[in-house]
Amino acid sequence: MTNTRKTHPLIKIINHSFIDLPAPSNISAWWNFGSLLGLCLAIQILTGLFLAMHYTSDTMTAFSSVTHICRDVNYGWLIRYMHANGASMFFICLFLHVGRGLYYGSYTYFETWNIGVILLFVVMATAFMGYVLPWGQMSFWGATVITNLLSAIPYIGTTLVEWIWGGFSVDKATLTRFFAFHFVLPFIIAALVMVHLLFLHETGSNNPSGLISDSDKIPFHPYYTIKXILGVLLLILALMILVLFSPDLLGDPDNYTPANPLSTPPHIKPEWYFLFAYTILRSIPNKLGGVLALVFSILILSLFPLLHVSKQRSMMFRPLSQCMFWFLVADLLTLTWIGGQPVEYPFITIGQLASILYFTIILLMLPIVSLIENKLLKW
């Protein structure tokens, strides 16, 4: 008798992806973040759907509708804070997932990596538009500042900004279209995730050693399903601790003040997960230069496959490259810290140095160190 799991047209796709998938026997907990990102996306889509049932995308009522969700809707406060803090968990998992890819050389899977970079851009765009929806002070001014950056594009800049705004300032039209995009983009993300997985399953997973593991594979289920469940439980635990004990820890108090175009907050800053890019943006005095640096700070990830000059794939056996990697991590943490500080001495200088260092480590130091290691190993 044939097994339905292996013959049914639909179930066999799931079987080949999550059950009988041959996986390397030595992948560590760093390989858990893919499944955790899938969980985060599912949580965000579900909580977002229930929030959208009660939210109104009108400048007059948006702020009140969020208040109404928190006060009057059954467990509305829970849904709202799970969605807000779920975004933070999403980005923590994203950064760790990308960091894992950089450390172990997963970027040599060219298509998978580039789809991942596109996913990162789309997730960042979605999160930015979501932050505008509660229509608090930081929502409004964040939207104004970031959309205004497009005016730095020569010739078409100003027209482009007014086209995105749907008027001459961030207003009702902007809020409505941001809500529409914020609703639809997660489904586009889900489709891109499918493509990401499609390309990944063409090659199979990388592993910590960076070596081909075809001779040593184990079935995904039960070994990695159990492992993934542990990760899921830990993620839900972390999320619920955040939601139930300090839901506003990562938020901005200014967003509890309704949007007022006549009053600018003293320090306009985005959510914590954008601070590193925000620092790079404001480290350059020139507007267009800042915008280009901002875009390139993420786009630079797609250059990693081209910058890989080492004879080894993973950094597991390359101590000098490991040092450079952790310098890069420390630099990103510095950039994140500076992004939350006011624009004054010494923060401006630290931000500029950290921004220069970020690009220097990636474009110069990592390849040079890799070449030195090749020489040391007489390759």
UniProtKB/Swiss-Prot annotation:
Heme b b562 binds at residues 83, 182. It holds the Pfam family Cytochrome_B. Heme b b566 binds at residues 97, 196. A ubiquinone binds at residue 201. It is found in: Mitochondrion inner membrane. The chain crosses the membrane at residues 33-53, 77-98, 113-133, 178-198, 226-246, 288-308, 320-340, 347-367. Heme 1 (or BL or b562) is low-potential and absorbs at about 562 nm, and heme 2 (or BH or b566) is high-potential and absorbs at about 566 nm. Component of the ubiquinol-cytochrome c reductase complex (complex III or cytochrome b-c1 complex) that is part of the mitochondrial respiratory chain. The b-c1 complex mediates electron transfer from ubiquinol to cytochrome c. Contributes to the generation of a proton gradient across the mitochondrial membrane that is then used for ATP synthesis. This is Cytochrome b. It comes from Cynomys leucurus. The gene is MT-CYB.
